[in-house]
Amino acid sequence: MAQLRELRNRIRSVKSTRKITKAQELIATSRIMKAQARVEASRPYADEITNVLTALADASTLDHPLLTERENPKRAGVLVVTSDRGFCGGYNANVLRAAEELQTLLREQGKTPVLYVVGRKGEAYYRFRQREIAKSWTGFTDRPDYSDAADIGETLVKAFLAGADDYLDDGGPDGTLGVDELHLVHTEFVSMITQKPSVKRVAPLEVEYSEEPQKTLRPVYDFEPDADTLFKALLPKYINTRLFAGLLDAAASEHAARRTAMKSATDNADEIIRTLSREANQARQAQITQEISEIVGGVEALSSAGSE
């Protein structure tokens, strides 16, 4: 009887947990669609600012720091994008592993990594390991805005423009720790099932030269003010756009990973409920069989006593 009561309590407990995981799965499914729509909506702007910058680069003679490779780079900023909440399977573990691999590579190249972290999970990971974080941002990983990317971009560009040569060991007068490179580590959304860690260098920008003829002619612009001024003003915005795209990608990946994890948890709960229900039925059958045996035995004993 005690075993049957325990099994029924466990079934009720698992069913209660299943309600939570199923609700989380449905919420994540709904949010994936919205996150994907935001990723798609941001692409036209990203494509257009890239085209404008390409035209400006052709017309400009400006040697901007964001385009210039530093000699003997000493420090590299690493922005790691994690989630604020859990229940998303290996999402955070995978991106943190990619970040650790990047930092190991940078150290082998003689560069000191400077950590910038997005998300409470990444912040907790590095705090627990007593790793110094230059700056962190939390509270928006599941639905980032452009203003969040602009805030991050302002900090990173400021650190990059300061450079590591000026302040080798400590921050400058305003506390900015200069770096010679900027890297972004986030999760790239491939599909509802597949999300993969991505490592990209954000600055200095890598300019690609192609000898292949263009398939379409680019429009010819007259710039007002001059191309150099516009180029200088748009480059930081381009950095912000790349960061925003990374944040949107990471948000979609987070929701997809959470949906997969919650669906797996719900399926596991269903399997546990089936197993426990089968055990409870067997225990109940055994109990009934025992009760019948006791009744039959009692009747036989009474019959024997009566015949005597």
UniProtKB/Swiss-Prot annotation:
GO terms for cellular component: plasma membrane; proton-transporting ATP synthase complex. GO terms for molecular function: ATP binding; proton-transporting ATP synthase activity, rotational mechanism. It is found in: Cell membrane. One of its GO terms (biological process) is proton motive force-driven plasma membrane ATP synthesis. The keyword Endoplasmic reticulum does not apply. CDD domains: F1-ATPase_gamma (cd12151). Pfam families: ATP-synt (PF00231). It comes from the Bacteria. InterPro entries: ATP_synth_F1_ATPase_gsu (IPR035968), ATP_synth_F1_gsu (IPR000131). F-type ATPases have 2 components, CF(1) - the catalytic core - and CF(0) - the membrane proton channel. CF(1) has five subunits: alpha(3), beta(3), gamma(1), delta(1), epsilon(1). CF(0) has three main subunits: a, b and c. Produces ATP from ADP in the presence of a proton gradient across the membrane. The gamma chain is believed to be important in regulating ATPase activity and the flow of protons through the CF(0) complex. Belongs to the ATPase gamma chain family. This is ATP synthase gamma chain. It comes from Saccharopolyspora erythraea (strain ATCC 11635 / DSM 40517 / JCM 4748 / NBRC 13426 / NCIMB 8594 / NRRL 2338). The gene is atpG.
